[in-house]
């Protein structure tokens, strides 16, 4: 199982991360490692595009919950984009869609919206 992670720093406060592949017990540590770099910064907006993620299990959810908690403690934001219906349902069933900001409009990653 492969995962691809691309990071684009738009400026010091806005970071876009594009993830493609499957997020499971095998690949989640790679995603976690990529996010940890930004979890120590204050006042940032970390935007993660999951448009190309075909599968996620509870390990992946745990990575995003951990990132959300760390970022919130530092007055930073986590925003998820481009979830498939299946992925969104996973966040919805677990109640995480009420806590973590989710925007399903893929084009918003290219705009100025945080």
UniProtKB/Swiss-Prot annotation:
Q: How is the protein modified post-translationally, according to the record?
A: Phosphorylated by RsbW on a serine residue.
Keyword annotations for this protein? Phosphoprotein
- Database matches in CDD domains: STAS_anti-anti-sigma_factors
STAS domain span: 4-114
Residues the record lists as Phosphoserine modifications: 58
The stretch of residues making up the signal peptide is none
Q: Which domain of life is it from?
A: Bacteria
PROSITE patterns according to UniProt: STAS
Q: Which Gene3D superfamilies match?
A: STAS domain (3.30.750.24)
Q: Which GO terms describe its molecular function?
A: anti-sigma factor antagonist activity
InterPro entries according to UniProt:
Anti-sigma_ant (IPR003658), STAS_dom (IPR002645), STAS_dom_sf (IPR036513)
**Functional description taken from the UniProt entry:** Positive regulator of sigma-B activity. Non-phosphorylated RsbV binds to RsbW, preventing its association with sigma-B. When phosphorylated, releases RsbW, which is then free to complex with and inactivate sigma-B.
Family to which this protein belongs = Belongs to the anti-sigma-factor antagonist family.
Q: Indicate what this protein is called per its UniProt record.
A: Anti-sigma-B factor antagonist
Species per Swiss-Prot/TrEMBL record: Listeria monocytogenes serovar 1/2a (strain ATCC BAA-679 / EGD-e)
> Lineage of this protein's species?
Bacteria, Bacillati, Bacillota, Bacilli, Bacillales
